[in-house]
Amino acid sequence: MDNHGILESLLFTAGDEGLDEKQLLEILDMSKDQLVELIENYSSHGLMIQRFGTTYVLTTKKEAATYIEQLIEQKSQMKLSQAAMEVLSIIAYNQPLSRSDIELIRSINSDGAVKTLIAKGLVEAKVVNEQRSQQLITTDLFLNVFGISNIEDLPTTEEDDEEMDAFFSNLVNQKGENND
């Protein structure tokens, strides 16, 4: 079996989670340049290999979207409550954030929504820059679900950016932290 077949088999087996680049390089015993070339030269009738952050996933081609949508029209893989969607958007656009930051923004306890997002693999808690509290960030699965390659691909407008900057500047001042 050639490397294209092996790569396809690995990504198919990994499913929606995909495989991290480091894993692929180790299993296939090749350099990053060789992997990139292999992916660029990959061709299949209905499938393609996409990169979401550092994860590679075997996906269907866009041309098949309408047929696939018809197949799964009645099923929703990732149902989220309104609260979970609000929290997810707050994290996505302002990460990293602590749970208390989210509660300050929403003025309501958001632990349930955060736990749901973590359980679904869309968000993870990490210690960032040696801060005392865990910081919430989106995952590669989030990128995959929303069909973007990196967080900078999220839709935004200049006006929204200015409003968010002003809001977070005010939030930092309310918490008594330095703006520097």
Curated annotation (Swiss-Prot):
Main location: cytoplasm
InterPro entries, sorted: ScpB_csome_segregation (IPR005234), WH-like_DNA-bd_sf (IPR036388), WH_DNA-bd_sf (IPR036390)
Key word Protein transport present: no
Subunit organization: Homodimer. Homodimerization may be required to stabilize the binding of ScpA to the Smc head domains. Component of a cohesin-like complex composed of ScpA, ScpB and the Smc homodimer, in which ScpA and ScpB bind to the head domain of Smc. The presence of the three proteins is required for the association of the complex with DNA.
Source organism: Staphylococcus aureus (strain JH9)
Protein's UniProt name: Segregation and condensation protein B
UniProt xrefs under NCBIfam families: SMC-Scp complex subunit ScpB
Annotated keywords: Cell cycle, Cell division, Chromosome partition, Cytoplasm
